[in-house]
């Protein structure tokens, strides 16, 4: 057990460190879903996305919304305000948001490892700045990769980004050990990660879906809650 002296010294040091530089001071949001709880830590290095997400949660924006787009071995997506009262089979995910958030792509610091929380956005043809939706987000599940698969992912990234996005050795190890979706790296803002409930994400990404990737049986966010 730490001595009182060490504890006091630790408290003194951490009190002098700005919040945005201290991982332990990250905000944590819990999504209470019909499949279980998912706890998300928000990155202080992406303050625009962090603050926007916290504001949405405080407003109750996500309460009652569906995971309207689910792709097995890829990701689960929510944030469409029309999903709250959607009829069975209704196509979702195309609601027009009133605002967008400037991209905060911090690659390679943050990348699309399994459990990553990222902002959805419009395509490059109409959104070359890669600005994010202020509302819609996704949580990565992905898959585990071997070196040959990662080489193919890098070749795709080289072509798509004109060689601007390179997988790092550390990132490759994460994709081999934990999994994720490297083909999205450097293209979307990753602003948090799953710290508990990855088993819930796994369960959701396995559900049966229709031709529009909407789950046949609704998977709903009952309530989003700020824990810290």
Predicted features and spans:
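Cyclophilin-like peptidyl-prolyl cis-trans isomerases
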Residues: 17-228
């Amino acid at each position: 057990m730490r001595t009182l002296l060490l504890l006091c010294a630790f408290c003194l040091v951490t009190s002098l460190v700005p919040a945005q530089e201290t991982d332990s001071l990250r905000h944590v949001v819990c999504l209470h879903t019909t499949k279980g709880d998912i706890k998300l830590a928000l990155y202080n290095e992406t303050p625009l996305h962090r603050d926007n997400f916290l504001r949405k949660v405080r407003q109750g924006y996500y309460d009652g919304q569906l995971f309207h787009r689910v792709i097995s071995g890829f990701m689960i997506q929510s944030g469409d305000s029309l999903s709250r009262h959607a009829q069975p089979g209704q196509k979702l995910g195309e609601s027009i948001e009133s605002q967008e958030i400037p991209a905060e792509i911090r690659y390679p610091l943050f990348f699309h490892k399994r459990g990553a929380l990222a902002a959805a956005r419009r395509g490059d043809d109409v959104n070359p700045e890669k600005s994010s939706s202020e509302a819609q987000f996704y949580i990565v599940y992905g898959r585990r990769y071997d070196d040959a698969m990662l080489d193919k992912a890098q070749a795709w990234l080289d072509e798509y980004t004109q060689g601007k996005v390179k997988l790092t050795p550390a990132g490759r190890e994460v994709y081999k050990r934990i999994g994720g979706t490297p083909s999205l790296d450097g293209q979307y803002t990753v602003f948090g990660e799953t710290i508990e409930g990855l088993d819930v994400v796994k369960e959701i990404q396995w559900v049966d879906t229709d031709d529009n990737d909407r789950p046949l049986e609704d998977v709903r966010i009952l309530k989003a809650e700020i824990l810290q």
